[in-house]
């Protein structure tokens, strides 16, 4: 019985982990920071809710780093949104993603159909990585 319970728990954990990774696209790997992203609606149940950019960032270095960045949304060459400057500390090999990590961005009134247009793009305005002794 314990073995069956352990196998079931392992299966559920694996399925949840895979679900959490699903849907992310690779953006870039710069200065030892691997960036992946995905777009989704703010409310899964409301087709008219705003589009949200979720980032998943991994420090692929063997040292801790302080990462300072801004995110910008563009309509063609026109900047329509820029986030405030953010700074996060990552231990060696650490990954973070989504809202709780401060890696979720949206612009009020911007819908999924807007981000799917050919003229729409997003990029980092600031992308600075500095090695630190430790994350406090």
Where are these regions (language model features)?
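Short, surface-exposed coil-to-beta transition loops
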Residues: 50-53, 66-68, 81-85
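Sec-dependent N-terminal signal peptides
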Residues: 4-16
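Short, well-ordered beta-strand segments enriched in hydrophobic/aromatic residues
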Residues: 53-59
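Intrinsically disordered, low-complexity Pro/Gly/Ser/Thr-rich segments with frequent PxxP/GP/PP motifs
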Residues: 77-114
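Short acidic, flexible loop segments centered on an aromatic residue
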Residues: 62-79
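Terminal connector regions
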Residues: 102-136
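Low-complexity, acidic Ser/Thr/Pro/Gly-rich terminal tails and inter-domain linkers that flank the onset
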Residues: 21-49
């Amino acid at each position: 019985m314990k073995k069956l319970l352990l196998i079931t728990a392992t299966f559920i954990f694996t399925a949840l982990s895979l679900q959490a990774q699903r849907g992310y696209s690779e953006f870039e790997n710069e200065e030892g920071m691997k960036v992946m992203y995905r777009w989704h609606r703010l409310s899964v149940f409301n087709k008219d809710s705003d589009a949200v950019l979720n980032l998943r960032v991994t420090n692929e270095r063997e040292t801790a780093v302080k990462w300072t960045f801004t995110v910008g949304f563009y309509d063609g060459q026109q900047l329509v949104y820029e986030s405030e400057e953010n700074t996060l500390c990552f231990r060696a090999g650490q990954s973070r993603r989504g809202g709780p990590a401060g890696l979720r961005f949206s612009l009020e009134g911007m819908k999924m159909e807007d981000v799917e247009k050919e003229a729409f793009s997003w990029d980092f305005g600031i992308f600075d990585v500095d090695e630190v002794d430790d994350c406090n």
